[in-house]
């Protein structure tokens, strides 16, 4: 979990910017979006093979 301590004489905008940067670096939001809806293992394998096929094609 990302934590941000707001320092003295620091604006909320700067603290929010630091928080967003730490969340994006830790991958928290990406992990949330990946797990938002359950995917059956068969669907996950199918998507993975389609992505590999797209990478090979280009």
Swiss-Prot record:
GO terms for molecular function: structural constituent of ribosome. The keyword Nucleus does not apply. Keywords: Ribonucleoprotein, Ribosomal protein. One of its GO terms (cellular component) is ribonucleoprotein complex. It holds the Pfam family Ribosomal_S21. The keyword Ribosomal protein applies. GO terms for biological process: translation. Disulfide bonds: none annotated. Belongs to the bacterial ribosomal protein bS21 family. PANTHER family: MITOCHONDRIAL 28S RIBOSOMAL PROTEIN S21, SMALL RIBOSOMAL SUBUNIT PROTEIN BS21. This is Small ribosomal subunit protein bS21. It comes from Lactobacillus delbrueckii subsp. bulgaricus (strain ATCC 11842 / DSM 20081 / BCRC 10696 / JCM 1002 / NBRC 13953 / NCIMB 11778 / NCTC 12712 / WDCM 00102 / Lb 14).
């Amino acid at each position: 979990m990302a934590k941000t301590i707001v320092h003295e004489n620091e604006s909320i905008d700067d603290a929010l910017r630091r928080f967003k940067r730490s969340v994006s670096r830790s991958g928290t939001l990406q992990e949330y979006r990946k797990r938002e809806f359950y995917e059956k293992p068969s669907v996950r394998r199918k998507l993975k093979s389609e992505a590999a096929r797209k990478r090979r094609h280009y």
